[in-house]
Amino acid sequence: MNTPPLICLAGPTAAGKSAATLALAERWPLEIINVDSATIYRGMDIGTAKPSAAEQAQVAQHLLDIRDPSQAYSAADFRTDTLALIEDIQARGRIPLLAGGTMLYYKALREGLDDLPQADPVLRAELEARAANEGWPALHAELARHDPITAARLSPNDSQRIQRALEVCLLSGRAMSALLTGTRRPAPSDLRFVTISLEPSDRAGLHARIAQRFDAMLQAGLEAEVRSLKQRTDLHPGLPSVRCVGYRQMWAYLDGEVSFDEAREQGIAATRQLAKRQLTWLRAQPERVIVDCLAAGTAARVVDIAARYLPG
């Protein structure tokens, strides 16, 4: 019996992926692999629009709450975890469904990754200690000496990427920009992918949804959620978790850098920019089935398309 292709349900923020996912789960014995770099974090539920407890009870969900906000999770980690999950889910006679909007994760899974050295905890701690004393701009200047191409595209305060680029240089003896031209390892050849892409027919309609969604998060307690994170001494604005859209704006508000209204407007604007980047990536993918996420019956349309590829 042939294994059905992997359905990838992709789309920008506020496109309605969650509702479509649940509709699919009512029809097939699915398990969801979340393709989302924010919902991996524990204690970050409201601002990430994480599936509710009731939704998680309806269908098995993977790659939720797998990291503390102080911890890193890379595209390479996602690829490793997802390939193992796909094998396990299929071995149990169930169907994996990839759903989410972190396009780098889709790219890593399908196209593979470059052979970069793994992070070294000792070296990472040394770099963080130096940054605490010298500041990230000083480490950015050091990176510019090792790898001017990578340094030129990074902000002097982009701590995560500066740290990683310096790690690569110091561990491998080569510039990250040079290593990124190396050979990639694509997904196993027996995996086939079908992308169902939820895309808006009208940009203004998506923007309205984004504003409504962000306001709903504020009403649900996003400020309190960020305040709780901010009370931790091991979290700071340079971490990927805190830089998530919505969180960094509320963090700035709680730091007194902006007013509440400014944080709201900046959060909505940042979400729109995220959606724009997501759509730009999707539109560059030639093989995708497009569903208008603003039309009535979007979830039913997704089910109809999936039925072309899934058994039963």
Swiss-Prot record:
ATP binds at residues 11-18. One of its GO terms (molecular function) is tRNA dimethylallyltransferase activity. Its EC number is 2.5.1.75. Pfam families: IPPT. The record marks 102, 124 as: Interaction with substrate tRNA. It catalyses: adenosine(37) in tRNA + dimethylallyl diphosphate = N(6)-dimethylallyladenosine(37) in tRNA + diphosphate. HAMAP family: IPP_trans (MF_00185). Belongs to the IPP transferase family. Monomer. This is tRNA dimethylallyltransferase. It comes from Bordetella avium (strain 197N).
